């Protein structure tokens, strides 16, 4: 089995974090985002994984090669000299992806879910088509391209309707596919879209199906969705009684869904949770309140600070009695001084904030 992960470009939507690291290496749930996908592919039986990269490939290579042995996979980097869209990378990696006749998983590196890849493969093999799209149900389909099914053949896709004005369905493309290698023959070696150019051909041939995704789904490519995805991920761990989570018997855990690295130090009288991730070597002072936030490694939250709906970047410091909220994102090595209020600030790396930021803005 083979898998291709569309890693993509600059990660501008997740700045300022991506000014320091490529987006797939930003920790989500205390692991690089892309590692969730590599693990899922390995668990589904993939032995060859291709990462389609066009930004800082050398950083990615250094960071991810170590995982080959751990997961028993071969990781190859397919470096695009120009962005090739969502279909071009398949053509670029054709030699690996078509080396045998087994199906190919394609994953978008921004998507977080429970990755039911074995069930997906079983479904794909059973229907006999050329490709399967994973579909997820949404509350507001008018924001998306919606999947419309054939009335007579279950799960066969009849057409796509982009941002429908009238209700035609509520299933959308979840950014996960399984394809037969022959699909690559439909793709030209140029920047091209699998959604807008390849899939319509398969629809016409009546060879494209959809598979309903159970559980949660989120594109975590921007800060507010990163935090929403974190909540869904932690809730899923709670349902599984995962031993990754910090025990609710700890006196500082407030409301559950808390994931704290064992190396982090927590002060007295803290209330942490619900929905909090704290990375390695973080120091949390006394009387700190953290809710719905991620604190990345080597950061310090000083006594009596309040942190809500915030991502605190690596090696950052939040001062005593400071208050952060409103989807604030601190880049790497940011210092927020004592008693400072930040609401929705996006703070670039290596900055020091000594004045209140009362309205959402970029701090350069």
Swiss-Prot record:
PROSITE patterns: HEXAPEP_TRANSFERASES. GO terms for cellular component: cytoplasm. It is an enzyme of class 2 (transferase). It holds the Pfam family NTP_transferase. Its main location: cytoplasm. Its EC number is 2.7.7.13. The keyword Hydrolase does not apply. Belongs to the transferase hexapeptide repeat family. This is Mannose-1-phosphate guanyltransferase. The gene is MPG1.
